[in-house]
Amino acid sequence: MRVFELRLALLTSAMAVMTVPSQAVANDSAANAEASSVRAGSRQFTPDFFTTYAPVTALDMVKRIPGFSISEGEGRRGFGENAGNVLIDGDRPSTKSDDIWTMLSRIPASQVEYIELSEQAGADTETQGQGQVINIVRKRTAKVNGTYEGTIIAGTRYGFQPSLNASATLRRGETSYELNVSSYSERVYGFGPEDFKTGSAVLLERRFYNGTGGHDQAALGGAIKTKLGDSKVNLNGQVRWDDSFDIREADYFNGSGVDTADELLLRGGPVSDISYEVGGDIEFSAVPKTNTKIVALYRSGHESAYSSIEIARMGQPVTLFETRSRNTPTEAVMRIQNDWSGLGGHAVQFGAEIAYNRLDARFSVANSVAGAVTSFPASDVLVQETRFEPFVSDIWTLGPSWKVEAGAIAEFSKLTLSGDSIAERSFQFIKPRAIATWTINPQTTLELRAERQVAQLNFNEFATSVDVTVGNQVDAGNADLVPEKTTTFSGLIRHKFLERGSIQFRGDYQLVDDTEDLVPITVRDSNGNITAQFDGTGNIGKSKRWNAELEITLPLDWLTRPIGFAGIEAKYIGHYHGSKVTDPVTGLNRRISHRPLWHQQWDIRYDMADLGLVFGASFSVQEPNYAYFLNEIRRQHEGTRSTLFIEYSKFSLGTLRFQVTDMAGFHRDRYIYAGTRASGALDQIVNRKRTLDPLLQLTLSGKF
């Protein structure tokens, strides 16, 4: 039924585009002064194109480019492979801590000269592997310019939480100085029951929870961009503070409704943690027809967390379970890339990247009953990885309509674990890639690609942790974890219409080796006897994945202008994610854990440019998420998240936005089996429901 509903939604959306009057579609071929094609596969957007939307920042402008979505990489290994599809003044920022959304929000819309969109293979050497890239080109001015944004988030049960973001840029000749400060504060109030039942669904106990959680963050960053002779030099840095908390209380009732116990949960993480990053690059030409860029990056910090859960049952001693963790991650990267244009019709890039990653993870657990404390052995693990990656690629222009990018990366890496887990492994991978794009006409692009990818390891999976919210469930560190390898074949077709409209369909098929999923982790004594079994992230062999994405942006002026108004735009994004893997516990085929089958989002906005008003709404929903543990199947279903907003852009101090968000609560169902899932004997059912208070948000944003 759900699959039918998904197909119906996709079909309905596609039909909406097909029913657009043919005359309106034909108008797209007319010349457009605000968004002109500068070469095949490329389009330039001047500020006039965005006037209707009254943008404050470059991010506001990028969001309105037809058929374009920001990509920040896909969790692959290496700095180069995680290149996004956004450039600023032709450069990729030499940072991993600052996301591109934040960086674009610091650029005033008034300082954007134009935005160029390229939609061909090898669209830019700075973003190899991306078939669609935008470049935000800023004006050169000696004036100080910047952006500011102040927000108050309010809830009915926790008051007001303010946040502030500001940035400023100063240019002096060939040098620019950038400074940015930001803060963020959020509170969420949640409540709802959790029912514990027998395998035959007889109620044993009901727990009613209510609690408040929050996250606070502050950051200070800056950058200097200059020229030394003919060389371009960029330096950047950031320091960030993070803190969060979760306080939850519960009353326990038996199946007859009698109050039997009280619970208090305290949890935090990060806990006033400080992290920092410094990076930079230098770009120069040492030999004719060759451009060289050297990138260096270093980041480190602390990641701490704590949790405690105290339960007082009638007539029984008070129990207290506590955990503490303190992790120190470190990363250092250096990359040199050379772009050679000495062969007509080709753009060759070659170079190498070297990286060092380190995680010092410390974890402890203690349990007390009636004040008597039992301390468990601490889990201390040091994970270190060194990686060397030479690479080469060639972008071949076959004509005005065809471009091909082909390349390969070789990886040589060594991973060591010491402390409570001891292991050492070496990896060698070849990661080839081929992309071809055909610009069928100025409105239509076809992209085909085949590539081999290696996923980035999450070093935290080598360390042990405990989730006190689901019965003190242990996530055991796995010293045998190796990177997931994926071979992907994909295709994409994109069509633009009505000047601001677009439809895009993407599909891919993936063959996966060493699939990452939940696996049973066995603990043995010195004699080889099993002492315990836990769940943890591990590799479960080969799997297959297939994905589809439909994105439609539909301006409705062709429909509404005949009846006297214009400015309504609708957008739909639908994702489908299929998968098949052999379960390590049952031996049967199933989907991969933590991979919802589908996700859909609908957006609609009405821009009243003359009045400076915008009305809008957004709705998103996804299929339940499943996870497969040793003795449990866990199903979590989040509700529909809805947002309504109104903006006024003619306020003297900037743009005012009032927003109401109906937070998506969730239902979590745990099906716990006697022994393992392979037994098929259902022992316990746990149903949890959480409802969240809506959020009210008032934002003032402006530029100077």
Task: Write out the residue ranges for each language-model feature.
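C-terminal beta-signal and adjacent terminal beta-strands/loops
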Residues: 648-704
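A beta-strand signature from Gram-negative outer-membrane beta-barrel systems
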Residues: 109-145, 560, 703
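Surface-exposed extracellular loop regions of Gram-negative outer-membrane beta-barrel proteins
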Residues: 302, 360, 414, 424, ...
